């Protein structure tokens, strides 16, 4: 599998090599007008999310789709649909929407999340990123979600339903 390489080009990161992406498109042909990010599919998700700090995970239904936990020596965090926030939540920030990079990402791929973050940062859209074994999820505040998807489309990402 060939590793992706990125170069900085006119304020967004563009791919200069693109091979071996499972379940994704191919690198555009030389001289093609097709965007360089073709093949990176962005899939918006329906739920409205909460980002929470919890005392423990006892009240969390981890069998629900889209439940993400993170535990460190300093805190226990939870990202879940708004309706699934447990009672033992210490703090919460509601009003997040999410999209994921469709397909499975190989661990050798680099710069994918950085490219998305750069496009959104250039438009002053804050993100909360979560990585799983298969792929990356990106959350933005609900008020910024449509603008984020539009910015990514403009940068050549393919938004699918």
Predicted features and spans:
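Regulatory modules associated with amino-acid/nitrogen control
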Residues: 2-3, 13-14, 18-20, 24-119, ...
């Amino acid at each position: 599998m060939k590793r992706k390489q990125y170069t900085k080009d006119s304020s967004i990161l563009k791919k200069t090599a693109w091979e071996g992406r499972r379940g994704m498109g191919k690198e555009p042909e030389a001289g093609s007008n097709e965007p360089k990010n073709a093949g990176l599919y962005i899939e918006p998700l329906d739920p409205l999310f909460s980002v929470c700090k919890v005392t423990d995970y006892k009240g969390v239904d981890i069998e629900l789709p889209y439940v993400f936990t993170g535990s460190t020596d300093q805190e226990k965090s939870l990202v879940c649909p708004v309706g699934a926030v447990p009672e033992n939540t210490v703090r919460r920030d509601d009003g997040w929407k999410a999209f994921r990079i469709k397909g499975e990402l190989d661990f050798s791929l680099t710069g994918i999340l950085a490219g998305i973050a750069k496009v959104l940062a250039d438009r002053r859209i804050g993100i909360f990123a979560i990585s799983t074994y298969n792929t990356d999820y990106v959350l933005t505040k609900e008020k910024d979600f449509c603008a984020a998807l539009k910015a990514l489309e403009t940068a050549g990402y393919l938004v699918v339903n």
